[in-house]
């Protein structure tokens, strides 16, 4: 996924298309509207679950390591701004009862915050679980008692639960390092963990939230392991984002193809991500413009950016 500005490329494609000046004007106005949209994504989980590595892998950045600003009104939740993609990184839970209470209050406050239009500020919550841990009590408490009661409408479409560190879920056993994927024994174990998490949440809240498992990977001076199922995670993030906001991701998705190479292949997640982004283009820019089937002409530079 190439590092071009998708909104600039859309504008170029429109200006070069054989449309009336009136339609061009409407289309360009719609692009400005799309560009002005904001996504607010809250990322939370237990200490050591891999929130920072997940943020860095998804969005081709290392801001989560260095931190770029703290909002003192939200109990040390860090705010990372990638243009109009705004990531709220909550401190990890599980470091003591008093700290957990403090951090939970910060999360509740953020979930109840409204934007300038009086709508919930947070579009989606990504809860990251530590796949190598047997004790997920802190995570269940966070999901069932903090997030779900405070997230408001459509919780099943606004909460994503992702089990990280799939590669070490069985202490490193049954992970095929050469092919960077789980062998059958580990795959069965992970699928059971997904089913168990789903069942526990359903029993406590009545909601049906489908977790996934993945590995954010790592890189240091001596070694590197590519992510696994990161494309599945991004696919779900994009899928559950309102259509009019999805394009905001396009400028910030990691351009490193190795990040997206390995998955369970249940779907072609990379293809589905592109389809979701194109859907956002089609729906967002054509409002009020008479272009009909001509919309395909717009996907010159824009198609390169997404693809």
Range-by-range predicted roles:
Residues 1-86, 91-281:
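Conserved GTPase G-domain substructure that encodes guanine base recognition and part of the catalytic core
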Residues 270-307:
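Membrane-inserting effector segments that mediate pore formation, membrane fusion
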